[in-house]
Amino acid sequence: VTTSAKDPYATFSPDELASRPTVFRDGLFRDQVIVVTGGAGVIGTALCVLFGRLGATVVACGRSRDRLEELSRHLARLAIPHSTDALTIRDPEQVSAFVDDVWERHGRLDVLINNAGGQFAAPATEITPKGWSAVVETILYGTWYASQAAARRWIAKNAPGSIINVSTVPGLVATGIPHTVAARAGQIQLTRALALEWAPHSIRVNAVGVGVVSGPSLHHYPPNAKPFFEANPMRRLGDVVDVAEACAYLAAPSGKFLTGVILPVDGGGSVWTEFWPLGKSDYFRVED
């Protein structure tokens, strides 16, 4: 589905992603291996296509085998070297085995992009323990498991590495998504802590603070949240290409002196923090 300013629920097709102009040179990531968790989602697909067209071998993982197979068909048609693996990012043993397999198959791992996530909007009193755990474990635990597994291999092999966490606007506080707010806050602080601890091993750890980007996932919010999708100084939604190119900037030599950075890709949303995932209740309205 083609994205447009009029349809916040649409996104780019893989073919459209592959044909869009980019500021990055061809072959920028040639001979590199890039792992993308949550690789079959809309942001994950954009990451796979961009890094692939810039020369990388892409390894995508995710929960849904069917969605990964669909992604694989698209990447094959675009002549992007790749492989896909179905796994549960919330299972540390599966994640560790997956990272081992990447090294065994490819002999290297250059960049890990922790993109797996997910959320739903609901009043805090109605979120079940299962719903809370699903979001927090996917975002925070999944980032930790994958980062630790990758770093262990890099350190053991005395190899440099780069970790990029696809996160959200730093300091975001919003009603209706307390599980996501908690998980993302932990993910951002984890980014900073690991950047400090792993710097002696030439492992850079950064994050992209993503604002509201167009795509089908916005259907998870009720209609009265729609007016707040563009609650940023640029008064528009971002798109998946904005996120993918920010990650490429951090992964490329352009980011070689960056670690512990949370790069906002949010249209200035971090300085205009009004976001109401369940819509704005009358209690918070200020009359003129």
Question: Which residues are covered by each model-predicted region?
Answer:
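Catalytic loop of short-chain dehydrogenase/reductase
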Residues: I155, I164-G186, T191-P200, V212, ...
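Conserved glycine-rich cofactor-binding loop
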Residues: V33, A40-G41
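Active-site loop of short-chain dehydrogenase/reductase
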Residues: Q32, R108-L109, W154-T168, P200-I203, ...
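Conserved Rossmann-fold SDR core element
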Residues: F51, R108-D110, I188, A195-S214, ...
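Conserved glycine-rich Rossmann-like NAD(P)H-binding loop of the short-chain dehydrogenase/reductase
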Residues: A56-E70
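Substrate-binding pocket helix/loop in short-chain dehydrogenase/reductase
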Residues: P123-A124, T128-V136, F228
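C-terminal helical subdomain
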Residues: T3-R20, P200, A207, K226-L258, ...
